[in-house]
Amino acid sequence: MLLALPACTPYTAALFSLVPDGTVPILLSQMQGIEESNRKRVAELEARKDWEGLTKLAEENLSRDRNSSDWWIVAGYAHSQAGRQQRASECYSEVVRLAPDDMLGWSLLAQSYRDAKQPLRAVQTLNNAHRVRQGTAETWFLLGESYSDLDRDLPAASAYREAVQRNGEFARAWFGLGRAYARLGRRADFEQALKRLEELNSPLAKELAELRPMSR
């Protein structure tokens, strides 16, 4: 991906950083449904952190084509960066409506609810997504994070396990799993998650080790 997200909220940055290249990218610059000239314009506005300009550009294009999921994503991103989380959620809901089989839309919608401090709605959104089609490592990770927001460590651990089963090198999911086990006091399971992080040479291993629970 070409365009970074220096201004994202921590939650949104976390979502986009799930892309395998390990950066904090945005999908805006490579959307096939957006003309090259507009992709460049999007990149320029994002680089300037001109969220009002980006919102206006998205709305102008949506006035011509209300069925463009790409422009709904751009609009949602702009609203999110401007702190308008409810508007962002409304835009991402349109993405889900237009492309229900695309897990990206569901993930963005769930993440927008987390940004708005509504983790229960994020959980409901991701569970609905998993009824539509099989989840990805990323959607299961987000579900684990959403349950963790609610201090529901048992379902969080279950979701994180689904994530690492789909991607055994997903360090942040292993960290979430270990953290859930620590909160549950499950020392043996915690040690397995920690060992895996150490095998991955992840800096998260040190952070997780500090959460080691008492034996149980």
Residue ranges and their predicted role:
Residues 33-81:
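Alpha-helical segment of the N-proximal tetratricopeptide repeat
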Residues 46, 73, 80, 114, ...:
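Position-specific recognition of the canonical hydrophobic site in helix A of tetratricopeptide repeat
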Residues 47-56, 81-94, 115-128, 150-162, ...:
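Structural signature of tandem alpha-helical TPR/SEL1-like repeats
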Residues 74, 108, 142, 176, ...:
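Canonical tetratricopeptide repeat
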